[in-house]
C-alpha cells in the first residue's frame, strides 16, 4: 500500500475520534470536519511544485518560493465532499473547485452520475478529490474514471475514513492515484457502510436522515 498515506498526526486522530461519537451535534461535526480537513491539507499539498520569485524585503531583494495555487483543482464528490472544501481553501485559497455528483444505487451500490462541473483547461492541473468516505470504492473509481478523461497531471483522493475493501478497489482500478486518509477502519457491512466508521457523513454534515 505504498500509495496509501495514513495521516496519524495527534490532532487529526483527536478530532476524528470526536467526530465518531454518535451524540456529536451537526454543528460540532461540521466544525470538526473543517478543522480536520485544514490539517490534512498540509499533508496532501506537501509535494506541490514551487517556483522561484524575487521578493523585496525591508532590507534587500531575495529569491523566495511560491506555489501556483491556480494549478490545483479541488473536486468535491457531492454532497458530503463539500465539507472538506473550506479547510483546503484556507490553506490554498487560489485553488479552483469542481463538483461531481454521484449517488449510490441502494440495490447495486453502483454510482450514478447526476452532475459534473469543472474549471476550464483541466489539462496539466493537479486534482485532489475530496469525499469523507472511501467505502466500496465505486464512487471514487467512477470519479477518477471521469476526471482522467480531462487529462490532468495528477489525481489524489482524500478521505476521512476508508477500509481494506475500498483501498483495494481503488488501487486495482487506478494504481497511480495516491490515497490520503485519517484512518483505515476494519471492514464494510452488508449495506456498504464502514465499520466502526462514523455513520453517514453527508447526513451528519447537513443534519438530514
UniProtKB/Swiss-Prot annotation:
GO molecular function: GTP binding; magnesium ion binding; uracil phosphoribosyltransferase activity
Keyword Transferase listed: yes
Family matches, as Pfam families: UPRTase
Regulation of this protein's activity per its record: Allosterically activated by GTP.
Keyword field contains Magnesium: yes
Domain of life: Bacteria
Record-linked CDD domains: PRTases_typeI
Catalytic class of the enzyme: transferase
Function: Catalyzes the conversion of uracil and 5-phospho-alpha-D-ribose 1-diphosphate (PRPP) to UMP and diphosphate.
Family: Belongs to the UPRTase family.
Name used for this protein in its record: Uracil phosphoribosyltransferase
Species for this entry: Polaromonas naphthalenivorans (strain CJ2)
Gene name per UniProt: upp
Amino acid at each position: 500500500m505504498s500509495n496509501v498515506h495514513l495521516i496519524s498526526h495527534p490532532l487529526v486522530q483527536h478530532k476524528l475520534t470526536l467526530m465518531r461519537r454518535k451524540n456529536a451535534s451537526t454543528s460540532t461535526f461540521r466544525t470538526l470536519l473543517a478543522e480536520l480537513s485544514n490539517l490534512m491539507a498540509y499533508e496532501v499539498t506537501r509535494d506541490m511544485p514551487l517556483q522561484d520569485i524575487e521578493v523585496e524585503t525591508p532590507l534587500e531583494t531575495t529569491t523566495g518560493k511560491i506555489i501556483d495555487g491556480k494549478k490545483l483543482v479541488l473536486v468535491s464528490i457531492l454532497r458530503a465532499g463539500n465539507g472538506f472544501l473550506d479547510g483546503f481553501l484556507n490553506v490554498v485559497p487560489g485553488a479552483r473547485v469542481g463538483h461531481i455528483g454521484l449517488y449510490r444505487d441502494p440495490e447495486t451500490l453502483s454510482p450514478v452520475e447526476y452532475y459534473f462541473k469543472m474549471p476550464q483547461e483541466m489539462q496539466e492541473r493537479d486534482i485532489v478529490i475530496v469525499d469523507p468516505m472511501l467505502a466500496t470504492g465505486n464512487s471514487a473509481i467512477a470519479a477518477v474514471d471521469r476526471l482522467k478523461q480531462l487529462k490532468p497531471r495528477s489525481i489524489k483522493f482524500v478521505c476521512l475514513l476508508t477500509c481494506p475493501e475500498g483501498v483495494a478497489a481503488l488501487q486495482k482500478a487506478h494504481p497511480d492515484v495516491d490515497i490520503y486518509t485519517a484512518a483505515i477502519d476494519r471492514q464494510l457491512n452488508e449495506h456498504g457502510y464502514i465499520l466502526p466508521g462514523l455513520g453517514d457523513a453527508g447526513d451528519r454534515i447537513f443534519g438530514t436522515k
